[in-house]
């Protein structure tokens, strides 16, 4: 094989001989073997210097540019690649069979054609079918053309013009400092009324709320360098507004005592007053009832004067506020027979009389204090077995015989018990128990 490459100033020339052309055929091999193929090009020295050399599989060498010379194989491939490149377009097909690119505007030629057809009096639905463009796109283009006189598409993406300029933020800060309770929509109206913004660039209510929250909200809390410029805060305790009851302080005229630590001044203007009441962030003793009762000594109001802060002293409280109903009411409730089974002795009542509050003592009409079974004198129902003591009367008919005497005795005993005042609630409970059964029961007061 013979390969020659000649380069000129403005032209290049490639010539070669195919030694293996005889394999294709004797006639073609002789014709191709005797002659030489020349390919010339007038591309200039730059193309000659950047000439690509391609070695074929048969051992031959080729030096052909992409756009040069008659190469059957390469030209055919290029001709086939052209339609394929045209077919590989990016887009989708709509319901009318037209091709569109999602997110991109319609070409200006189609836009102009839509406007021209509309000026000829063709309906938008007919334009949509003829140009294979969706009806919404046609209507939108025509509406914009009638409003602005332009067929150009709007801006894709981008951002709106900035409305929260430093001047607007400054005015919003001034409005908020002048009136801390102002609303965002009121600030928007004042921006329009003062001429700071017009109706096109006025910020929305949400934007004003965001400015108040992010930019101006941080300015409300002074920094460390601004603390010296501001006047000292008022000596108001933060928990006075949380708790509605009076807080004992050294400056209060009531004269209540308050524990002060040594070395701490007790002046009213000093902020670091020792807190004997739990603060707003305290978790321990959150109700503070015991602390408050120990400090004040009694409950506030007219009711508190009658009670002592200690529960042990409540046994001597007057029971005039708790009226007792007649004991005959106990005989009128036969439905509570199930509760009568549980007996309770008088000694247990006298034992607990020293530390129970006055309202916890049972009245004379309660049935839980009976120590004898009540089936004999309460209702003519089925007889109950004796629990601890023998029945007062025989079962069954005993109710009819002794019912009147029992009621009269109980009424007399109850009237006698209400005439005199017992010295203590424990004694009253014992007396009521004795008046019910008509038997003297000794009670020990401890």
Curated annotation (Swiss-Prot):
The record's section on InterPro entries has: Homeodomain-like_sf, PAIRED_DNA-bd_dom, Paired_dom, PAX_fam, WH-like_DNA-bd_sf
Keywords from the UniProt entry: Activator, Developmental protein, Disease variant, DNA-binding, Nucleus, Paired box, Transcription, Transcription regulation
Select a single GO molecular function from the record's annotations and give it.
Answer: DNA-binding transcription factor activity
Q: Where is the protein found, in the record's own terms?
A: Nucleus
Q: Which CDD domains match?
A: PAX (cd00131)
| A Pfam match | PAX
Task: Show the segment(s) annotated as Disordered.
Answer: 414-446
- This protein's major location comes to nucleus
Residue intervals annotated as DNA-binding region are: 89-215
Functionally, this protein is described as follows: This protein is a transcriptional activator. It may play a role in the formation of segmented structures of the embryo. May play an important role in the normal development of the vertebral column.
Descriptive protein name: Paired box protein Pax-1
Give the originating organism.
Mus musculus
């Amino acid at each position: 094989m013979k390969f020659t490459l000649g380069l000129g100033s403005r032209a290049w020339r490639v010539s070669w001989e195919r030694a293996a052309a005889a394999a294709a055929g004797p006639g073609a091999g002789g014709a191709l073997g005797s002659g030489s193929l020349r390919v010339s090009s007038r591309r200039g020295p730059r193309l000659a210097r950047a000439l690509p050399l391609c070695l074929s599989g048969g051992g031959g060498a080729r030096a052909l540019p992409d756009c040069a010379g008659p190469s059957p194989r390469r030209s055919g491939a290029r001709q086939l690649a052209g339609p394929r490149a045209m077919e590989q377009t990016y887009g989708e097909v709509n319901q009318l069979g037209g091709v569109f690119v999602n997110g991109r505007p319609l070409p200006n030629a189609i836009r102009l054609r839509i406007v021209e057809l509309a000026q000829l009096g063709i309906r938008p639905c007919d334009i949509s079918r003829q140009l294979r463009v969706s009806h919404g796109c046609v209507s939108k283009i025509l509406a914009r053309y009638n409003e602005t006189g332009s067929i150009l598409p709007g801006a894709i993406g981008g951002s709106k013009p900035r409305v929260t300029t430093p001047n607007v933020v400054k005015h919003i800060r001034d409005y908020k400092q002048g009136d801390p309770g102002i609303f965002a929509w009121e600030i928007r109206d004042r921006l329009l009324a003062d001429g700071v913004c017009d109706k096109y660039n006025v910020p929305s209510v949400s934007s004003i709320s965001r400015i108040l929250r992010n930019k101006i909200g941080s300015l409300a809390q002074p920094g460390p360098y601004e603390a010296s410029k501001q006047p000292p805060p008022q000596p108001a305790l933060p928990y006075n507004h949380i708790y509605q009851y009076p807080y004992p302080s050294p400056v209060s005229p009531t004269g209540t005592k308050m524990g002060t630590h040594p070395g701490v001044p007790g002046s009213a203007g000093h902020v670091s007053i020792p807190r004997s009441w739990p603060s707003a962030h305290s978790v321990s003793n959150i109700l503070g009832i015991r602390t408050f009762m120990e400090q004040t000594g009694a409950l506030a109001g007219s009711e508190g004067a009658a009670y002592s802060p200690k529960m042990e002293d409540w046994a001597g409280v007057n029971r005039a506020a708790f009226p007792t109903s007649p004991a005959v009411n106990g005989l009128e409730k036969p439905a509570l027979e199930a509760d009568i089974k549980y007996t309770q002795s008088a000694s247990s009542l006298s034992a607990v009389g020293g530390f129970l509050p006055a309202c916890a003592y049972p009245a004379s009409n309660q049935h839980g204090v009976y120590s004898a079974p009540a089936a004999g004198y309460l209702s003519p129902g089925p007889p109950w077995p004796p629990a601890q003591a023998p029945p007062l009367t025989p079962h069954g008919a005993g109710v009819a015989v002794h019912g009147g005497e029992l009621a009269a005795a109980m009424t007399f005993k109850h009237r006698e018990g209400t005439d005199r005042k017992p010295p203590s609630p424990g004694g009253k409970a014992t007396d009521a128990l004795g008046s019910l059964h008509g038997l003297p029961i000794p009670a020990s007061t401890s």
